[in-house]
From Swiss-Prot:
Cofactor(s) needed for function: [4Fe-4S] cluster; [3Fe-4S] cluster
Functional summary from the UniProt entry: Ferredoxins are iron-sulfur proteins that transfer electrons in a wide variety of metabolic reactions.
PROSITE patterns per UniProt: 4FE4S_FER_2
Keyword hit for Ribonucleoprotein: no
Residue span, 4Fe-4S ferredoxin-type domain: 3-31, 36-67
Name this polypeptide is given: Ferredoxin
Amino acid sequence: MAWKVSVDQDTCIGDAICASLCPDVFEMNDEGKAQPKVEVIEDEELYNCAKEAMEACPVSAITIEEA
């Protein structure tokens, strides 16, 4: 299975918890907002990591959906 990861740039407040919890999937861009390092995750371990980051996001800016 594969999952698509996205971050709503208008919603993100740049607290970087996602990049801290899951640095293989998320990074901070030049504007101080989170962005995915990869658009599609095929590894279940990375999916679980990204899901944890999504649940920890204080403004619900992260979306994960089946690709």
